[in-house]
Curated annotation (Swiss-Prot):
Stated name of the protein: Vacuolar morphogenesis protein 7 homolog
Alphabetized UniProt keyword annotations: Coiled coil, Vacuole
Gene3D superfamilies: 1.20.5.110, Phox-like domain
Coiled-coil zones: none
Domain of life of the source: Eukaryota
Length: 341
């Protein structure tokens, strides 16, 4: 079982009593599949206590010692050094005989037939974004091919629909697991759910396009075309009322709401309108991406400010304790002076 195990990143989690560091263990299988397991440091300690007695030749890496002075929540250097030490530890676990132990398999969330497991791969926070972008890119490409009239068989179109649906299901399941594991903040979870909802709307639109493209269209009969009483007949006499009805029926609808025609859209057919909408959305995406570095910088500043506030609170607590101790000493000194006086 040639596994590649690493700890690429960490995150913070908390409850009403304390905060702690969560280590993201990424397990990659030989077939290309991978998943992420979230563990705390005390879970590493519990695992080591179970398997350390079996280390007769001292081949297993040692766990980093627990620090009673500083915390990985506030000390970034300590958190990084512990991450590297734990990464070396889990890489030792990928070797025989440790990887064959049931307790290690349970710790790494590895099933007995993990080499053949290719479905339902759990995505970490970074992989989730990459798969989402690939899914959106593929959906856009399939839709452009369909709208441009390329000769694509029904089987290929159906395969594309199921491929996108499978990726979206995996994204949804992985996001639920990330939320349960507190691997992402509530704001980021909500943002990614909105991204999935928007992608789902685009997917439903693509499914309707595939269905309409594959459904046979009955040709109009000659009698209906030549019948002047038919409202759509080209031989029907024009009048004010009929012209108004025809204009209303021939308005193109893009999306849910009916948009008024402009000088630009009147010159375009359906494919041109679709390409124009895509170009508009790409421009909006570029504007959003240009704002991303600013938002990330603000996030980093917020984290630095939060860390500074935590350190200042700790210093104030120490100062308060020292002031309380000095006050007690002062009371004792005054009491002694009263006895002497």
């Amino acid at each position: 079982m040639a596994l590649k195990i690493k700890i690429p990143e960490t995150s913070q989690s908390s409850d009403e009593y304390s905060r702690w560091t969560v280590y993201h263990i990424e397990v990659a299988f030989p077939n290309g599949g991978k998943h992420v397991v979230f563990r705390r440091f005390n879970e590493f300690v519990a695992l080591d206590a179970q398997i350390r007695p079996n280390d007769y030749n001292s081949r297993l890496c040692k766990l980093p010692s627990k620090s009673w002075v500083s915390s990985t929540v506030t000390n970034e250097k300590l958190r990084e050094s512990r991450r590297l030490a734990l990464q070396a530890y889990v890489q030792c676990l990928s070797e025989t005989p440790w990887i064959k132990m049931p307790v290690v398999k349970k710790f790494l969330n590895i099933k007995d037939e993990s080499e053949d497991e290719t479905q339902g791969q759990f995505l970490g926070p970074t992989d989730w974004i990459q798969v989402f972008q690939d899914c959106k890119r593929n959906l856009h490409m399939y839709r452009v091919d369909l709208m441009s009239g390329k000769s694509i068989t029904i089987g290929v179109q159906t395969k594309n629909v199921y491929a996108i649906k499978s990726l979206m299901d995996n994204l949804s399941e992985s996001l639920d697991k990330l939320e349960l594991a507190n691997a992402l903040g509530p704001g980021e979870i909500l943002r990614r759910k909105d991204m999935l909802e928007q992608l789902g709307s685009e997917f439903l639109s693509f499914k309707r396009l595939v269905k309409n493209a594959n459904s046979p269209v009955a040709p109009p009969s000659a009698s209906s075309q030549l019948n002047s009483s038919n409202p759509s007949s080209p031989f029907r006499p024009l009048s004010a009322s009929t012209d108004k009805q025809s204009n209303t029926s021939l308005n193109r609808v893009l999306g849910k709401n009916r948009m008024p025609e402009t000088q630009t859209t009147k010159k375009l057919d359906n494919v041109g309108l679709y390409n124009m909408q895509n170009q508009t959305m790409e421009d909006q995406d570029m504007q959003a991406e240009s704002l991303l570095p600013i938002i990330q910088r603000q996030k980093e500043l917020s984290k630095m400010i939060n860390q500074e506030v935590v350190e200042q609170n700790s210093m104030l607590d120490e100062l308060s304790n020292e002031a309380y101790a000095n006050q007690k000493k002062l009371h004792r000194t005054r009491a002694g002076l009263r006895k002497l006086g």
